[in-house]
């Protein structure tokens, strides 16, 4: 596996699809969105998409809320988009045959607003994930402005199997790992807006935590894990980047720079998914029905008595 860095609602039941063998060329678009400037951010997305297509990427992933920036507060309604909006259609068209993940504020039914990310390939949107866990503690206040998503759901992607998306805080909750394992994901994509916290010498605590989570998820799921964070400043806070790819055995494959915008290309061998699952068949041995029964018992004890 190699990397190149260039500066710069009812769920449907789908048949399981095994990823094809061979390489998946991923582009990690570690950008610095401008807060509230949707047009400028759209242009930056189009620039990165053009480069990624020229470099032969199969998939490009942008950070959480990549079209808007993070600390939106009262301008959330002003920057929100419907998933059928012309701006999103423009991105999907520009990506062409390349798969695309980007973050946006989605306006849903009843004028509710969601921190969301969409996945598109071959000219159409296949999936939109709405962030389930909205941090509202410390410097975070998402529950004041966003509605929470209600599910974690995987989907079938052409050529590389089952894909799941989580957004930032979702990655910190064990329920997302449990559900994604039950969904038999092959590739887990986590889009992030994480500022640098817990700085001690050259190390950034949040960066170390995301790497630890990615390595843990990859081994539990036997999956390829992509984490894409942003860079830049908002409200005096620094977003550290350090986007990364971890293989299904928990090995760090590639990592983008800290603090700088970059477009990092990573060639991932999908055959490693099969090899790792033969060596460590955690998914095969998982007791899903027992887990469901135990959770139902806990639900009755905690919420129905």
Go through each PLM region and give its residues.
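Cys-nucleophile CN-hydrolase/nitrilase-fold catalytic domain and related Cys-dependent amidase chemistry
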Residues: 2, 38, 47-132, 194-223
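C-terminal beta-strand edge segments of enzyme domains
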Residues: 2-14, 216-305
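N-terminal active-site segment of His-dependent metallophosphoesterases
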Residues: 2-59, 189
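A structure-centric signal for secondary-structure junctions around beta-strands
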Residues: 21-23, 114, 240, 260
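Fold-independent oxyanion-binding glycine-rich loops
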Residues: 31, 65, 103-105, 122, ...
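CN hydrolase (nitrilase-like) catalytic-core segments centered on the catalytic cysteine
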Residues: 83-102, 168, 172-263
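Active-site catalytic loop in hydrolytic enzyme cores
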Residues: 83-86, 108-212, 278-282
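Short beta-strand scaffold segments in enzyme catalytic cores
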Residues: 102-104, 115-119, 153, 243-245, ...
């Amino acid at each position: 596996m190699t990397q190149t860095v260039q500066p710069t609602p009812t769920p449907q039941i789908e048949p399981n699809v095994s990823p094809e063998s061979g390489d998946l060329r991923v582009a990690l678009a570690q950008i610095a969105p401008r807060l509230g400037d949707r047009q400028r951010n759209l242009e930056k997305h189009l620039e990165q998409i053009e480069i990624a297509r020229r470099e032969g990427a199969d998939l490009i992933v942008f950070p959480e809320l990549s079209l808007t920036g993070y600390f939106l507060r009262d301008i959330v309604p002003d920057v929100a988009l419907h998933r059928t909006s012309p701006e999103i259609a423009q991105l999907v068209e520009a990506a062409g045959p390349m798969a695309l993940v980007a973050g946006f504020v989605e306006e849903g039914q009843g004028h509710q607003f969601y921190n969301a990310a969409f996945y598109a390939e071959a000219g159409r949107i296949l999936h939109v994930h709405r962030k389930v866990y909205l941090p509202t503690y410390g410097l975070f206040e998402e529950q004041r402005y966003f509605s929470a998503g209600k599910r974690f759901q995987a989907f079938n992607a052409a050529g590389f199997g089952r894909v799941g998306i989580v957004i930032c805080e979702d990655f910190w909750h064990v329920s997302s790992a449990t559900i994604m394992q039950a969904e038999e994901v092959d590739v887990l994509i986590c889009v992030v807006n994480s500022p640098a916290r817990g700085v001690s010498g050259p190390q950034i605590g949040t960066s170390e935590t995301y790497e630890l989570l990615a390595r843990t998820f990859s081994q539990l799921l036997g999956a390829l894990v992509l984490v894409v964070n942003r860079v830049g400043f908002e409200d005096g806070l620094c977003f550290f980047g350090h986007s990364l790819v971890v293989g299904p055995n928990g090995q760090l494959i590639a990592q983008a720079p800290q603090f700088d915008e970059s477009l990092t290309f990573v060639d991932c061998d999908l055959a490693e998914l099969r090899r790792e699952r033969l060596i460590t068949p955690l998914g095969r041995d998982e007791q899903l029905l027992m887990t469901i029964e135990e959770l139902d018992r806990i639900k009755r004890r905690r919420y129905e008595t």
